[in-house]
Amino acid sequence: MAHGVDRTRRIGEQMRRDLAQALVDIVHHPHASLLSFTAVHLTRDLSFAKVYVTHVLDNEEERSELVAELNAKAGQFRHYLAKNLSIRKVPELQFYYDQSVEYGARMEQLLTHLVKDSEHKD
């Protein structure tokens, strides 16, 4: 059981690295070079992959546009992966914006604010 999980994680990490390399050739968006693939979560049977990305853009509309372009070019990414991965069937890809970095920054900001408030009360 654990062996299957390790294999899935290992393949996901390899996919993440390969997708980053393919990005420059496939996506011709002006801000594509500022994009990072943060994680790939695969189903146990390797038929489907959720690919999480982050971007330094603050503009929600541009981020949505970029993720939509990634999803539109999922077939090209799959073709690239098929040439580079040693697996029988390349999973279907779905791209999502990873909000965890922003969420973490917001939590840190709130905690800092709480600490400052408690220092002022003392």
UniProtKB/Swiss-Prot annotation:
Q: Which spans are transmembrane here?
A: none
Q: Which domain of life is it from?
A: Bacteria
Keyword set, alphabetical order: Cytoplasm, Ribosome biogenesis
Signal peptide, first to last residue: none
Subunit comment for this entry? Answer: Monomer. Binds 30S ribosomal subunits, but not 50S ribosomal subunits or 70S ribosomes.
HAMAP family, A to Z: RbfA (MF_00003)
Protein known as: Ribosome-binding factor A
Origin species = Dichelobacter nodosus (strain VCS1703A)
Gene from which the chain derives: rbfA
